[in-house]
Regions:
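Nucleotide-activated sugar donor-binding and catalytic core shared by glycosyltransferases
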Residues: 1-248, 258-396
């Protein structure tokens, strides 16, 4: 029997230990990864409930990262995934509203642009201060569902925490209050630094039979690349030609939706393209830092490229998209936007690899190097709960 959304939260309670009561909402692998250090830091200083919407329900997209990143299991699983997108979004809002109404947190914290972030709609209706990390990111591509979510969550949030000055300017252009917008930087450097010894110690190459520097790492899962027929065929024809051209394994960290799409289409991948279940945090990053090239549509690619360059492990980073919400990483030359057609993708891989061989690496993005982002977030949340209650909601 399929899980049903959880609407009864009578069993969920804060510890009531006198600390600020904060609910952190997650739902996908990227949120769990980026928030790892923030969640652990908040648990030290606040009374925290971690709520998981269930948007990513596969263990390899979810549970393995709690283990790798030394995170306690969420106090709440909403099981909000519905039969279609409308049902899922509706369940996320409904479940979150009921959770917030029952537990009465002092604040709600979300990160990014996933459907799980729509939980803040319930918090807004209940006059609960909302804190949004990764605010102000824009790629200006209306085909991306995340772009809609970004606008909604930025506008609803009471305090927006941006990664960069680019993002802060976007927020200002939207008319959002400058006095409640801060640049914290990306939380990824802190997470990667905290896990660097485990990343370097991973035996993933031995387990998978791969030789360092002689494989291409592939990650392709975005809706616009997988669900759109034209883009899907263009991308995977290019991947097959890449395998033929470089004559080396292409390890494809393949999400369930991508695997299902490939199976349903009957598309024949080159034998050198190896489909693998999504990899854990330590294994994936060990593979990145030792790859001939990394070809990915992941939003964290620019941040990971910047970090590994800063610690002496640069890799050729190629983004299989036509836009980016991280222009600050383009400013510093940390990755190449390749598009998804065969010619431009192969040219981009060639260029990135040759530049790396010549020692022409990008420069670490200043907004991506701070390793105290979790501390900044704790101080901002503690500072602004009272201010929002007084200045926005007139509670006292």
């Amino acid at each position: 029997m399929e899980k049903q959304p959880k609407f009864d939260y009578s069993d969920i309670k804060f510890k009531d230990n006198g600390k600020l009561k904060l609910i952190i909402v997650v739902g996908t692998r990227p949120e769990i990864i980026r928030l790892a250090a923030v969640i652990n830091k908040c648990r030290l200083y606040f009374d925290v409930i971690l709520a998981h919407t269930g948007q990513n329900y596969d263990y390899n997209l979810n549970g393995i990262f709690f283990k790798d990143l030394k995170l306690a299991e969420p106090e709440v699983y909403m099981d909000a995934v519905g039969d279609d997108l409308g049902a899922t979004c509706g369940n996320i809002i409904n479940c979150s509203y009921k959770l917030f109404a029952k537990t009465k947190p002092d604040g709600v914290l979300v990160l990014g642009d996933t459907n799980s972030c729509l939980s803040v709609i319930g918090a807004k209706r209940l006059h609960i201060p909302i804190f949004h990390m990764e605010a102000g990111n824009r790629c200006k591509d209306e085909c991306l569902p995340e772009e809609t979510n970004r606008r909604i969550v930025d506008i609803i949030s009471d305090v927006n925490m941006a990664y960069s000055e680019h993002a802060r300017r976007y927020l200002a252009d939207c008319g959002l209050p400058k006095e409640r917008t801060y640049v914290t930087g990306s939380p990824m450097a802190e997470v990667l630094h905290n896990n660097l010894s485990e990343i370097e110690a991973s035996d993933v190459h031995q387990r998978l039979g791969l030789e360092k520097g002689k494989y291409i790492l592939l990650s392709a899962h975005r809706e616009e690349n997988i669900d759109t027929e034209k883009n899907f065929l263009s991308l995977f024809n290019a991947i097959n030609h890449m395998a033929e051209k470089y004559d080396m394994p292409i390890l494809y960290s393949c999400h369930p939706r991508s695997r299902n799409r490939l199976a349903a289409s009957g598309f024949q991948l080159d034998p050198r393209v190896i489909q693998h279940e999504p990899l854990g945090f330590h294994d994936y990053n060990c593979l990145q830092m030792n790859a001939f090239a990394v070809v990915s549509d992941s939003g964290t690619l620019p941040e990971e490229s910047s970090f590994f360059t800063s610690v002496g492990h640069p890799f050729p980073a190629i983004c299989i998209r036509t836009s980016t919400e991280r222009p600050e990483a383009i400013d510093k030359g940390d990755f190449i936007i390749a598009g998804i057609d065969e010619k431009s993708l192969l040219q981009a891989v060639d260029t990135a690899v040759e530049l790396c061989k010549d020692g022409q690496h990008g420069i670490p993005v200043p907004d991506y190097v701070d390793e105290n982002v979790s501390t900044k977030v704790v101080k901002i949340v503690q500072s602004y709960v009272g201010i929002i209650n007084k200045m926005v909601w007139r509670k006292f």
